[in-house]
Amino acid sequence: VFRSLAMKATPSRVAFFIARSTVGVFFALSAIAQTSWATEGADRAKPMCAACHGTLGVSTIPSIPSLAGQPKVFIENQLVMIREGLREVPAMTGMLDKLSDADLTALARWYADQTLDAGVAQASATPPQSARIAAGATMAKQALCGTCHLPTYLGQSQVPRLAGQREDYLQQTMVLMRDGKAIGRDSIMSSTLRGMNDEQLRDLAHYFSTIGTKP
């Protein structure tokens, strides 16, 4: 019987079974790896980050950003910069010192995989105001914000998501960037925001924060 089966095992059939087995092993290993980083990221986030950034990365605390749904590379880069002291975040001083690059990557991937409920983040902020939203949308278009942050403002790679982010955090951050006081942040933003007054930045922040919220 085995000899008969062997005779039927043509090179093409052998290649097919090898390929199918290889694909099966690949997906199995991928699933294991995904489960590993997801578990590790969640385990790291709960004791260290949840108190301020929310259990699933959606902040309800004034001036604290939501991390859910941010691009993985952006989160990863910011975590490294904070750990290395290249970006100043007083509340996080020393918190990341003992985390390895692999730990930070796991955190970044986990937060990037979470869903940002913009309504939750916006709940304690200013209620949506149509006039300010329109003004902010106009400012965003004139400043070409969608060129880097994407037309949806969901961010990409090293560029952060603006859609649904906390309004107060966005406003404070843009003021710091405009005034050249955002140490460790993208210097391009300083020139982009230069010349905008506080009211214009408030409208921009209001507009971005309401994207994705229910009417």
Which residue stretches match the model-derived regions?
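Gly/Gly-Pro-rich "capping" loops immediately C-terminal to redox-active cysteine motifs
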Residues: 42, 57-87, 93-99, 137, ...
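Post-cleavage N-terminal segment of exported redox proteins
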Residues: 1-38, 55, 72-133, 173-183, ...
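Generic preference for hydrophobic/aromatic residues in regular secondary structure cores
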Residues: 6-7, 142, 149-152, 213-214
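Sequence/structural segment immediately N-terminal to covalent heme-attachment motifs in c-type
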Residues: 36-56, 119, 123-151, 166
